[in-house]
Amino acid sequence: SGLVRLDEEAGAVIATYNAFAGSLVREHGLRIGVDPDSTLITGARAWQIAVRIVEERTAPLPVDRPGAAASVLLALEGALSENLLTVDEAAERLDELVALMEGIGSVRGCRTLVRGAPEALTARLGMLEAVAAYRDYKRRHALLDFGDQIALGCRIAEEAPEVARQLRERHRAVLLDEFQDTSVAQIRLLSALFAGSGVTAV
């Protein structure tokens, strides 16, 4: 399960953030339409899938070599998961950034400051399309990667308040080690589950 029972009588449990989120997905994934028996894939398997996605694309990507493009795809997909963004949300923000760069370029004396930026940003939309294909592949084959665990766990915590209530009753005190306060996904997951209860972060 990814969890290690330290003291059966006291009910103490220790887990990494990913293992804890993964247990939420296994126990409550059906609440958000996720197969609880989904397979957690390794980084190597994720890279193989990403290479396949890249090689099957007919539209050009901003990175030519399949291996390099796959690495960029996975990094981008991980960033979206970390910030709990859908591909559509990221594309919308990218469009806004393109419009901003074009606006700056239209100001007298500022064109050289943003030369090539709108075109480079627009090219990134193709990479977002590849990310969408990668996510669709995982969904169709009931696969999860490590980034999915916390993102899906967060969805469960926010959309199923009864789960949070059960966990707060089960774990009266929570100690967070090496908590990443820059991680949107971690903050939202743990806030949805344990805000207002006995939580200590170190």
Where are these regions (language model features)?
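General secondary-structure edge motif
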Residues: 4-5, 30-33, 111-114, 129-133, ...
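Conserved helicase NTPase motor core
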Residues: 13, 38-46, 50, 116-202
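Conserved ATP-driven helicase/translocase motor core recognized via long
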Residues: 48-143
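Conserved P-loop NTPase-based nucleic-acid remodeling module centered on helicase motor cores
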Residues: 1-81, 85, 89
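General "foldedness" signal
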Residues: 26-34, 38-39, 64, 87, ...
